[in-house]
């Protein structure tokens, strides 16, 4: 029941969303801090960053270059709506995309990895439609960068991820809903 991938990306909205102490030390895990609400203090983020360093997790900040520099994050996560170019900052960049046009935009921004959204059907009201394994594999063959699937990944379709032509996977809401999924993955 294990999924063997080279990279695991976990989205968090605050530092209390995930307890890093329960995860095993692993170089393959990357945590993306994506806070759209109330900004946490720099002290809390620095403490969380140090915990990630101890566990050998990579830590990325979403769409905030100054905060990424202040926290000494491993890189910057660029959302699909963010069109700025960060080539001159010498950071590890991860992008997010929903279609082929956005993938090429992220390549121009300098992203080495793109998290491509909705692999499976999700339970959100306004977000309908999904790619499926076959369409994702066809798109990933045409891209020169690493595409990481996101969306709809849950306990019931974990084994389908072995068929996905990708070096990793990304989890957003499943970690918050059912933390036990992390035991099956890592």
Name the predicted role of every residue range.
Residues 4-12, 29-33, 59-61, 76-78, ...:
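Hydrophobic faces of well-ordered beta-strands that scaffold small-molecule active sites
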Residues 31, 68, 106, 114, ...:
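Conserved, mostly hydrophobic/aromatic
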Residues 12-24, 64-66, 99-105, 154-159:
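Short, acidic/polar
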Residues 76-87, 115-127, 152-186:
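Glycine-rich phosphate-binding active-site loops on the catalytic face of alpha/beta enzymes
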Residues 24-89:
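N-terminal active-site wall of soluble small-molecule enzyme domains
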Residues 25-26, 71, 109, 142, ...:
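Structural motif
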Residues 93-122:
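Histidine/lysine/aspartate-rich catalytic loop segments that bind and position anionic ligands
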Residues 44-60, 88-100, 128-152, 186:
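Alpha-helix-loop-beta-strand connector modules within alpha/beta enzyme cores
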């Amino acid at each position: 029941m294990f999924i063997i991938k080279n990279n695991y990306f976990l989205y968090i909205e605050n530092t209390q969303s995930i307890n890093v102490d329960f995860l095993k030390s692993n170089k393959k895990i990357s945590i993306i801090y994506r806070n759209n609400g109330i900004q946490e203090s720099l002290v809390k983020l620095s403490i969380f960053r140090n915990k990630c360093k101890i566990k050998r997790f990579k830590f990325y900040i979403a769409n905030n270059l100054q905060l990424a520099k202040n926290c000494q994050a491993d890189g910057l996560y660029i959302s699909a709506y963010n069109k700025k170019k960060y080539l001159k900052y010498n950071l590890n960049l991860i992008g997010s995309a929903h279609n082929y046009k956005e993938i090429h935009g992220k390549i121009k921004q300098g992203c080495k990895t793109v998290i491509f959204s909705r692999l499976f059907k999700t339970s959100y009201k306004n977000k309908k439609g999904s790619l499926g394994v076959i369409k994702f594999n066809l798109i990933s063959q045409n891209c020169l960068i690493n595409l990481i699937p996101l969306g709809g990944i849950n306990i019931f379709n974990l084994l389908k991820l072995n068929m996905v032509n990708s070096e990793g996977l990304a989890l957003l809401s499943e970690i918050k809903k059912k933390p036990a999924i992390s035991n099956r993955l890592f």
